[in-house]
Amino acid sequence: MSSIDLSTVRTFLLGLQERITHAIAEVDGQPFMTDHWQKEPGETLQGNGITKILEQGRVFERAGCGFSHVRGPRLPPSATQHRPELAGAAFEAMGVSLVFHPRNPYVPTVHMNVRMLAATPVGENCEPVCWFGGGMDLTPFYGFDEDAVHFHQVCKDSLKPFGDDKYPRFKQWCDEYFYLKHRQEQRGIGGVFFDDFQELGLAQSFAMMQSVGDSFLQAYLPIVERRKDSLFGERERDFQLYRRGRYVEFNLVWDRGTHFGLQSGGRTESILMSMPPLASWSYQRPNEAGSPEERLYKEFLVRRDWV
């Protein structure tokens, strides 16, 4: 099919999942529960995966990191909206996706995903096509410039070997993607995001995906260590739960990954592990002028050049 051996991609993804969950468990002090799953014969999707989840830890209220490798007879609409020529194509997809919801409101929520998708177009003598996607983004509840700068600098450094254009392109893509249109609001401070990517050739495109995945711990752990023991009270916890509601709204209304999983017959329990354990909504919640909560909206939930 290509110069990419799918077993090589799978081995990398499984190793990445293991490295990340080991490091997070070390910080938290509680191990991840591991759930090996297999799609049942006769289901639309076939394949398997490993869901690792940590709940009610010391640092993380919920931290989920999932690997999946599935095959299906027909790409769902969410995967073909930018590639209409692949409508009806059989496909194979694998990836690692994580969302970590910290307990302390001063520690930001984080999301990271790296994935590969291969599809065989309908028709005679059609060559299979393969592409990569991925990225990471940070969603603070209380904004700190040094955290945002650090996160974006690591993202930029991970992409530098693949061209100076990649970080600004993928940062803009991230800002545009993680936007709640119905709220006219950014989800967080962004990061980098790319999809349907093969322009460097398959080997280098895979290498770029690897670099992004490998840089995750360097981007996130220093922020966790800096904020996890900060003192907080009921006010900060209440605001954290309110802002988590926005995370839920984005994932269920706008996220292509969630839609892809649900439309293709994916494993619902694993797809929805990105949901926070608790969230809240209140009607037209005001923010006190000059407060840290107002500062989040004015200075952090806006598109900015952090590096």
From Swiss-Prot:
* Source species of the chain: Polaromonas naphthalenivorans (strain CJ2)
Record text on subunit structure and interactions: Homodimer.
Going by the entry's taxonomy, the superkingdom of the source organism is recorded as: Bacteria
Q: Disulphide bridges in this chain?
A: none
Q: For site (Important for dimerization), what residue positions does UniProt give?
A: 182
State its cofactor.
Answer: a divalent metal cation
List the HAMAP family: Coprogen_oxidas (MF_00333)
In residue numbers, the region (Important for dimerization) covers 247-282
Q: What does this protein do?
A: Involved in the heme biosynthesis. Catalyzes the aerobic oxidative decarboxylation of propionate groups of rings A and B of coproporphyrinogen-III to yield the vinyl groups in protoporphyrinogen-IX.
The protein's location, in the record's own words, is:
Cytoplasm
* Name under which the protein is recorded: Oxygen-dependent coproporphyrinogen-III oxidase
Which residues make up the binding site for a divalent metal cation?
A: 101, 111, 152, 182
UniProt keyword terms in alphabetical order: Cytoplasm, Heme biosynthesis, Metal-binding, Oxidoreductase, Porphyrin biosynthesis
Xref: SUPFAM superfamilies: Coproporphyrinogen III oxidase (SSF102886)
